[in-house]
């Protein structure tokens, strides 16, 4: 069993997102699962895709650093993403990572004029921090838009059908007890997800 964690936050060591990552890693390792963390800011990942790279990807020519990310994703049974929601979307670092890594021929292909996802058989969970309340986001339908476009929409397109996500809201104003409850929830969901996958393997 292989678990890949993709983390994007510029305050990569002291943010609440990092605390989530640490709990997810611990829960995974306690089950004896091989666990890999890709901390995009600490890695200084280059999120900018060039036109040359875009053209080359369609010909199967992939930069070495992207091939490495392909290997991590290819081997993963569970992919966990941890990131803040900024301007109703991914941080630019994570968006650029996905632009470069979910390349044609790896994440999807084209057959008879239609796209087909190539990442079947993988599960995904996302833990997303937001500055406002979850209830307010739900009131305006933001959660549904995120789900349709950036969460299930994007990853279903690439063949990942088993996608769960959790919004953690008001992270700048809640107290330590509330934060601890969120961390416990992230750990419990990770344990449950991996336990179910282990039972199927």
Task: Go through the PLM ranges and name each one.
Residues 1-106, 173, 177-201:
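N-terminal beta1-alpha1-beta2 submodule of the flavodoxin-like/Rossmannoid cofactor-binding fold
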Residues 92-93, 99-201:
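FMN-binding flavodoxin-like domain, especially the glycine-rich phosphate-binding loop
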């Amino acid at each position: 069993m292989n678990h890949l964690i993709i983390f994007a936050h510029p305050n990569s060591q002291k943010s609440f997102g990092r605390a989530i990552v640490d709990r997810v890693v611990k829960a995974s390792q306690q089950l004896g699962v091989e666990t890999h963390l890709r901390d995009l800011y600490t890695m200084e990942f280059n999120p900018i895709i060039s036109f040359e790279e875009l053209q080359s990807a369609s010909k199967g020519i992939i930069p070495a650093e992207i091939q490495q990310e392909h290997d991590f994703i290819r081997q993963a049974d569970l992919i966990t993403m941890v990131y803040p929601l900024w301007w109703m979307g991914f941080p630019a670092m994570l968006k650029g990572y996905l632009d470069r890594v979910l390349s044609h021929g790896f994440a999807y292909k084209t057959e008879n004029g239609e796209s087909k996802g190539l990442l079947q058989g993988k599960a995904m969970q996302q833990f997303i921090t937001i500055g406002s309340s979850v209830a307010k986001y739900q009131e305006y339908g933001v959660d549904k838009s995120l789900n349709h476009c950036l969460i299930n929409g994007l990853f279903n397109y690439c063949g990942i059908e088993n996608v769960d996500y959790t919004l953690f809201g008001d992270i700048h104003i809640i107290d330590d007890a509330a934060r601890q409850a969120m961390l416990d929830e992230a750990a419990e969901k990770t344990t449950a997800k991996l336990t179910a996958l282990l039972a199927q393997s």
